[in-house]
Amino acid sequence: TVFFQPERQGKTAAMNRGMKLVDTPIVVFTDANTMVNRQAIREIVLAFEDPRVGCVAGEKRIAVQAKDNAASGGEGIYWRYESTLKALDARLYSAVGAAGELFAVRRELFAEMERDTLLDDFVLSLRIAMQGYIIAYCTEAYAIESGSADMREEEKRKVRIAAGGLQSIWRL
């Protein structure tokens, strides 16, 4: 289902608005520029069979072509490393946060976020973990995105993530 709103208010506002209109027990979020594998939704739903699971994080993969630049290549290496850490964390108990490219939550655990939230995926998933639920990590559900077009774009992305990290510390 698509819920149209003519004015842009940001992703967090869209999530807050959309969640008021959803009646399914599980809600899956992706980024607009993300492609997911065919079995992703099925694999995510299976992870929710464990009642301790409140959020399921999919794996982020970067599509790197031979013609791509160093920014894309470096981003791909970073996400392979990050994915390994998330999988190890989840094996011990719970992943720490979810990436916005592909994650899902139990609808009843969603709490409206501040409209200016920079890292909605991280804040939402950690708030669910703070309620005592596990963030499962599902490597069989993955999202594929293109890497940063150039180093300037990658720098802007990193600055936004750093600012969002600081904002998250204050809010959590």
Where in the sequence are the language-model features?
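Residues within well-formed alpha-helices
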Residues: 13, 17, 29, 43, ...
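Conserved strand-to-helix beginnings and helix N-cap segments that scaffold or border functional pockets
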Residues: 15, 38-41, 148-151, 155
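Short loop->beta transition adjacent to catalytic acidic/histidine clusters or analogous donor-positioning motifs
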Residues: 1
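Catalytic donor/gating beta->alpha subdomain of glycosyltransferases that bind UDP-sugars
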Residues: 48-82, 116-120, 125-172
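Long helical/loop segments within the catalytic core of UDP-sugar-dependent glycosyltransferases
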Residues: 4, 12-14, 20, 24, ...
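Nucleotide-activated sugar donor-binding and catalytic core shared by glycosyltransferases
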Residues: 33
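Walker A (P-loop) phosphate-binding loop of P-loop NTPases
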Residues: 8
